[in-house]
């Protein structure tokens, strides 16, 4: 049997895929074209992701593959999928599969070389009106510090230089929400001497002054704040059930920017076209983003998802209008990023060389924040070096090492 794995969706899904791969012998893992069997780990978070997942399943079936499907789409629509696509096998636990030889002592197979994600929890206890994740993944469940340290040691032995901590609500680790438990975990991980530790998905309400101070004084935790605000209008934030106000956001950003030892890098993401979003709310969001408080901005069109609190609202904003608002925010975010990158020209930055001709700066998370091109090829990869920025190429950078 030759088996290929297709991962769709977020970094948390990638960790799941890598763990599933660990149940198979390396020699059985193959490219898509050589494989007779395909395992697809789906995303079912929003409409676009659901369409992509279905398309991948049907393509693999059409290509004559034996298809096994798992992930959020299966957790959410397993019965419907089994009825509509009987050619595929849909599963929630790899150990439930019959007729496939699995290793008894699985070891996670990394698909990335110099960085890896450490998923510290599953599920979410938040009640955001637009989000289906609690329905799909269940309530928040944390892994123990001991289990995570053991996994991190394994990743370190595999040559990982950057450890990226992820979950649906990272600072809610061990259902503490007062930052103390996540600090205990970070203390334990710092002892392993990863050069870079990055945290993703920081819920605004959970970012305390003490946590900010910890980042400011940490030797390896990067001053990278990924804070998905979703909106800035108080009307929309209240309807979204986010639990904070515009004033709270500005107070938080002021605290972060008051760091004494490090210069913070901020990323956020926003939803446009939410059912109750009026033009004035959208203009308020544009004005907020235009203040250039964030280095990186992600934007998504609202997806009307059954089972969510917001599903009771009339999804009245036309698709064309959602697309217009999306394009305005996206274009603005790209302009801001180009300006911020231009300001880096002539400065020295720390980079992780991932390939002979490219790298990432400490302020760039994989896949979403752009890349760094090397003017001259590096003979070594997997090393962190100082580099001088000599140009910005759109939203990317060119450096001399």
From Swiss-Prot:
Binds 2 [4Fe-4S] clusters. One cluster is coordinated with 3 cysteines and an exchangeable S-adenosyl-L-methionine. Residues 1-108 form the MTTase N-terminal domain. It is found in: Cytoplasm. Its cofactor is [4Fe-4S] cluster. InterPro entries: Elp3/MiaA/NifB-like_rSAM, Methylthiotransferase, Methylthiotransferase_CS, Methylthiotransferase_N, Methylthiotransferase_N_sf, NA-bd_OB-fold, Ribosomal_uS12_MeSTrfase_RimO, rSAM. Keywords: 4Fe-4S, Cytoplasm, Iron, Iron-sulfur, Metal-binding, S-adenosyl-L-methionine, Transferase. Its EC number is 2.8.4.4. Residues 110-339 form the Radical SAM core domain. Transmembrane segments: none annotated. It catalyses: L-aspartate(89)-[ribosomal protein uS12]-hydrogen + (sulfur carrier)-SH + AH2 + 2 S-adenosyl-L-methionine = 3-methylsulfanyl-L-aspartate(89)-[ribosomal protein uS12]-hydrogen + (sulfur carrier)-H + 5'-deoxyadenosine + L-methionine + A + S-adenosyl-L-homocysteine + 2 H(+). GO terms for biological process: tRNA modification. [4Fe-4S] cluster 1 binds at residues 10, 43, 72. [4Fe-4S] cluster 2 binds at residues 124, 128, 131. One of its GO terms (molecular function) is aspartic acid methylthiotransferase activity. It is an enzyme of class 2 (transferase). GO terms for cellular component: cytosol. It comes from the Bacteria. It holds the Pfam family TRAM_2. PROSITE patterns: MTTASE_N (PS51449), MTTASE_RADICAL (PS01278), RADICAL_SAM (PS51918). The keyword Iron-sulfur applies. NCBIfam families: 30S ribosomal protein S12 methylthiotransferase RimO (TIGR01125), MiaB/RimO family radical SAM methylthiotransferase (TIGR00089). Catalyzes the methylthiolation of an aspartic acid residue of ribosomal protein uS12. Belongs to the methylthiotransferase family. RimO subfamily. This is Ribosomal protein uS12 methylthiotransferase RimO. The lineage of its organism: Bacteria, Pseudomonadati, Aquificota, Aquificia, Aquificales.
């Amino acid at each position: 049997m030759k088996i290929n794995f297709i991962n769709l969706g977020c970094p948390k899904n990638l960790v799941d895929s890598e763990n599933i791969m660990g149940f198979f012998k390396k020699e059985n893992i193959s490219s898509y074209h050589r494989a007779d069997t395909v395992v697809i780990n789906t995303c079912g978070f929003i409409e676009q992701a659901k369409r992509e997942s279905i398309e991948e399943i049907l393509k693999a079936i059409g290509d004559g593959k034996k298809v096994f499907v798992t992930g959020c789409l299966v957790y959410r629509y397993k019965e419907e999928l089994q009825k509509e696509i009987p050619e595929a096998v849909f599963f929630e636990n790899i150990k439930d599969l019959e007729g496939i030889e699995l290793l008894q002592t699985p070891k996670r197979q990394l698909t990335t070389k110099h960085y890896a994600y450490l998923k510290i929890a599953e599920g979410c206890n938040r009640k955001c009106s637009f989000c289906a994740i609690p329905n799909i993944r269940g309530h928040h469940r944390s892994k123990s510090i001991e289990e995570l340290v053991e996994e991190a040691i394994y990743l370190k032995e595999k040559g990982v230089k950057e450890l990226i901590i992820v979950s649906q609500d990272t600072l809610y680790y061990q259902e503490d929400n007062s930052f103390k438990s996540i600090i205990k975990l970070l203390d334990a991980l710092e002892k392993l001497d990863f050069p870079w530790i990055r945290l993703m998905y920081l819920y605004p309400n959970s970012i305390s002054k003490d946590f900010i101070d910890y980042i400011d004084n940490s030797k390896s935790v990067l001053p990278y704040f990924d804070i998905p605000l979703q909106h800035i209008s108080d009307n929309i934030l209240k309807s979204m059930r986010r639990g904070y106000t515009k004033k709270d956001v500005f107070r938080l950003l002021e605290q972060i920017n008051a760091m004494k030892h490090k210069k913070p890098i901020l990323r956020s993401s926003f939803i446009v076209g939410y059912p109750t979003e009026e033009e004035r709310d959208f203009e308020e969001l544009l004005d907020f983003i235009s203040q250039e408080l964030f280095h990186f901005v992600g934007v998504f069109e609202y997806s009307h998802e059954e089972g969510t609190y917001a599903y009771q609202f009339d999804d009245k904003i036309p698709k064309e209008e959602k697309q217009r608002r999306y394009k305005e925010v996206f274009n603005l975010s790209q302009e801001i990023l180009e300006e911020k990158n231009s300001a880096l020209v002539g400065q020295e930055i720390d980079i992780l060389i991932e390939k002979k001709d490219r790298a990432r700066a400490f302020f760039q998370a994989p896949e979403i924040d752009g890349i760094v091109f090397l003017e001259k090829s590096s003979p070594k990869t997997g090393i962190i070096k100082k580099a001088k920025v000599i140009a910005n190429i759109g939203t990317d950078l060119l450096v001399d090492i």
